[in-house]
């Protein structure tokens, strides 16, 4: 490294004769490093929905935008408490049968940070048309982004137990 802020090595630089910073005597102040700006944060509630016969719900993300076309566990925006999460599950036409665990996770993308609250619960019903109910084999065949890694690991372990 030759062109370093606070410690320039102009003598070793092949471009020293062309350098505007050196000509202006600014080499100890350039280049200027940009400070990391805070990433916007987004709260999500993720649902690891399982059935008594050993399947879990997945849905495909939209074809445009972040993680487009990949598979995800059903989720909604916001950090829902258990009562609100139960209402969200009911809106999908599912009946919560047994709440099993609450999992939290964080995933940092280059431009946004997700804070996820997850609920694992056994449900009855088919849910919306965009839900795919996957067994262990079907889950492993789906491209689920690492953002949902904690939930994927939990789902895979639960489906193996079935």
Task: Cite the ranges covered by each PLM segment.
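Intrinsically disordered, low-complexity, charged terminal extensions of DNA damage-control enzymes
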Residues: 1-162
């Amino acid at each position: 490294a030759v062109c370093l802020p606070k410690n320039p090595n102009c003598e070793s630089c092949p471009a020293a004769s062309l350098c505007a910073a050196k000509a202006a005597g600014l080499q100890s102040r350039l280049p200027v490093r940009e400070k990391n700006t805070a990433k916007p944060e987004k709260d999500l509630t993720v649902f690891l929905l399982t059935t008594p016969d050993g399947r879990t719900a997945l849905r495909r993300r939209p074809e445009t935008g972040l993680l487009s076309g990949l598979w995800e566990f059903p989720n909604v925006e916001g950090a829902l408490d258990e009562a609100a999460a139960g209402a969200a599950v009911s809106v999908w036409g599912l009946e919560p049968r047994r709440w099993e665990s609450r999992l939290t996770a964080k995933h940092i993308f280059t431009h946004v940070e997700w804070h996820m609250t997850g609920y694992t619960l056994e449900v009855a019903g088919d849910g919306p048309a965009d839900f795919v109910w996957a067994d262990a084999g079907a889950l492993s065949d789906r491209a689920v982004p690492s953002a949902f890694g904690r939930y994927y690991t939990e789902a895979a372990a639960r489906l193996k137990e079935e």
